[in-house]
Design a protein with these regions (language model features):
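Membrane-proximal intracellular helices of multi-pass ion channels
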Residues: 1-502
Length: 502
């Protein structure tokens, strides 16, 4: 992927080819990525064979179809110029998630593990976007190969979004994408590495280390190797798919709950901070404004809910703290695991969890939501506005990590926040139009747009989303996609000006 996103080869205004979209280059990238997905299918087929299951044949059917389409795309890409424009970049990231979902649903559908096209697409989109919402009412009935593929979709999706947000977005710049630029707000901390491909390899290595470390700890806690790997895939990606219908509560193990809660939080932190730690600059982690904001929020919400569970639900202190920490970590990092039915908790705690869902994790992590960096900039700008009302002539810049945030970045944050709320409102109204209850509609929309997983009411952590109307599932699948790709990266393709030369 490094050669495709080499900034030295990006279109700067003068090119031998004046076409608006470099279709051949897009075909080449998508073709290569489909071959990579085929390799993942092959791995899942091997898992099925290891367990003596017949589902391997459905993965082989999918591989044949996948490689055929990938091959056609590569043939069509012959003679492609090795350059990409901003438009090409937006097309690639959107089409990649869509095509991966389209082909990724086929093993579920071919095996009849999920016999409905709508449900299979929803389940796979929920996986690749690391949302974790499921339509399955009997997860254990799936074969090991399908369960492995289900968790692997989340690990691939999380891996992809780390590369997308830290390596790809800063190249393109502009609008909300500037939010991730080192020049804009120092998110990548002195340009983590000058070469995008090298930086991506380091980030993927960190991603793999977190996954392996958690797998080992979960096995120590009593999980089988298969379950430990699948849950580590889901945790590191902040996805939330489990191999059990009861999710993590199935094991009823405090050790396992603490391990997963800690790794959810670790996965919600900006991955470039880990890179700085590896370079011997560990102080940067604790000096980072977003990291401190995120940890304060997790700590405060956990303590408040702990007291509520002790004094209103009569939990003992350790259990209350453990359940509160786990569910706050799940909501704040947009992971979909559950150890308790929070529908039975005091109602005010639902609002705290919704706040955590909206906030999400840190920029440059696998988590979803609005992101703490945006909320921090928004809050500091509001604080400055109050000061400006008292001191009209005062110069009050917004600072993050001691760097002044430009007015254009502040404007992009405000725009993103307003548009995020608009998407919630629009999705909420649409779901109620199709017969979903007011609380359920609100929570499933927030959960889907923030890539969280569980909602409230009939679609809370104790229930699947199978009862949703098909139309609602397609709407929520679209919200998952735009939420995963930061709204504008997808919606820009529906703007007429995107396809016009101006």
């Amino acid at each position: 992927m490094g050669e495709f996103y080499n900034p030295d080869k990006l279109y700067k205004g003068g090119s031998r080819n004046n076409s608006l979209i470099n279709k051949k280059m897009i075909f080449r990238v998508l073709g290569v990525l489909l071959f990579i997905e085929s390799a993942m299918f092959l791995l899942c087929a091997a898992v099925s064979l290891c367990y003596g299951e017949q589902d391997y044949q459905y993965f082989l059917y999918t591989i044949l179809l996948n490689t055929l389409v990938g091959g056609v795309l590569l043939i069509c890409s012959r003679g492609a110029e090795n350059r990409l424009t901003r438009r090409d970049g937006y097309c690639i990231v959107t089409f990649t998630w869509f095509l991966f979902t389209l082909f990724g649903m086929l093993p579920f559908y071919f095996s009849r593990g999920i016999p409905s096209v709508t449900d299979a697409f929803f389940e796979t989109m929920s996986g690749f976007t690391t949302t974790g919402a499921t339509i399955l009412d009997d997860i254990e009935s799936l074969s090991h190969g399908l369960l492995f593929w289900r968790s692997l979709t989340q690990w691939i999706g999380g891996l992809g979004i780390v590369f997308f947000t830290i390596a790809v977005l800063p190249i393109f710049g502009g609008g909300t994408i500037q939010l991730f630029s080192a020049e804009a707000i120092g998110v990548t901390h002195d340009k983590t590495h000058p070469r995008i491909d090298v930086m991506a390899k380091w980030l993927w290595m960190i991603y793999a280390i977190l996954t392996i470390a958690e797998t080992v700890l979960l096995m120590i806690g009593g999980m089988s190797f298969f379950d430990a790997v699948c849950h580590s895939f889901s945790t590191t990606a902040t996805g939330g798919y489990s191999t059990k219908q009861a999710s993590v509560a199935y094991w009823n193990s405090p050790f396992i709950e603490y391990v997963i809660a800690i790794f959810m939080i670790l996965s919600g932190i900006n991955f470039s901070l880990y890179f700085m730690c590896l370079k011997g600059k560990g102080k940067r982690l604790f000096q980072d404004d977003e990291f401190r904001w995120f940890m304060k929020s997790v700590s405060i919400l956990t303590l408040v809910i702990t007291f509520a569970l002790v004094f209103q639900n009569h939990y003992d202190w350790e259990k209350a703290f453990r359940r509160a920490l786990f569910q706050v970590a799940t909501a704040h990092t947009s992971c979909g695991f559950a150890t308790d039915d929070y529908n039975l908790w005091p109602s005010f705690t639902w609002m705290l969890l919704i706040f955590a869902m909206l906030s999400g994790g840190c920029t440059g992590s696998t988590s979803g939501g609005i992101k703490n960096m945006r909320l921090m900039i928004l809050a500091r700008n509001i604080k400055n506005e109050f000061k400006r009302m008292l001191h009209p002539r005062a110069v009050l810049p917004v600072r993050v990590n001691r760097q002044v945030i430009s007015p254009s970045i502040i404007a992009s944050v405000n725009t993103f926040f307003v548009f995020y709320l608009f998407c919630i409102l629009a999705g909420w109204i649409l779901l109620m139009f199709f017969g979903v209850g007011i609380i359920e509609a609100m929570s499933t929309v927030i959960s889907s747009l923030g890539n969280v997983g569980p909602g409230l009411g009939a679609f809370g952590p104790a229930f699947s989303w199978a009862a949703l109307p098909d139309a609602a599932k397609w709407i929520l699948s679209f919200l998952m996609l735009i939420g995963r790709l930061e709204l504008f990266a997808v919606l820009l393709l529906f703007y007429s000006g995107f396809w016009e030369r101006r």
